[in-house]
A protein has these predicted regions:
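Phosphate/ribose-phosphate-bearing ligand recognition and processing surfaces
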Residues: 91-184
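Glycine-/small-residue-enriched capping loops at alpha/beta junctions
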Residues: 1-116
Length: 184
């Protein structure tokens, strides 16, 4: 596991910011920034599908897709993570189509699936900030605020939440969000 750039205790859980390839993380579940088909795509979605192997695509094809703001869980197959939680974030349309609430729903749903499946650790990418063009700073504040709220009120066995970024430059958004919430 990479050394965290930031690590903070919130209730019973440790929240961490790391720079790493999410497909290499040995956690109970990694979150895939998926599209509604769940059949793979570019960015982190494509990387997760490639690393997990064809069995992931086969399982995803049986799920019938997923609505924006929601998530589905599959096995991790060839990944170090036991499971993949496929969260479908919103495409940014200037904030006029309920995008912040839909993004928060992705994080809540992923945490719910983690707890419902008896899992204890989860790693999130920056959902919707790539080709879906969600502003990275706003997305980081929504992600962290949602996770802190959920973990503080009802952790349900989740003891580790990792926010995983592909570069130091992108991780700064999350570090700033921690500071804005007074968690640094």
């Amino acid at each position: 596991m990479p050394t965290p750039l930031l690590s903070v205790e919130v209730g019973p859980a440790r929240l961490e910011v790391v720079v790493a390839d999410i497909t290499t993380l040995a956690v109970d579940a990694i979150v895939n920034a998926a599209n509604t088909s769940l059949l793979g795509g570019g960015g982190v979605d494509g990387a997760i599908h490639r690393a997990a192997g064809r069995e992931l695509l086969e399982e995803c094809s049986t799920l019938g897709g997923c609505a924006t703001g929601s998530a589905r869980i599959t096995r991790g197959y060839k990944l170090p993570a036991k499971h993949v939680i496929h969260a479908v974030g919103p495409v940014w349309s200037g904030g006029k189509k309920n995008e912040p609430d839909l993004l928060a729903s992705c994080y809540r749903t992923a945490l719910n699936l983690t707890a419902e499946n008896g899992l204890h650790s989860i790693a999130f990418p920056a959902i919707s900030t790539g080709v879906f063009r969600f502003p990275a700073g706003l997305a980081a504040r929504i992600a962290l605020g949602t996770v802190v709220s959920e973990i503080s009120t009802n952790a349900r066995g989740i003891d580790r939440v990792v926010f995983c970024y592909f570069s130091q430059e992108s991780a700064v958004y999350h570090i700033n969000a921690f500071a804005e919430l007074g968690l640094d």
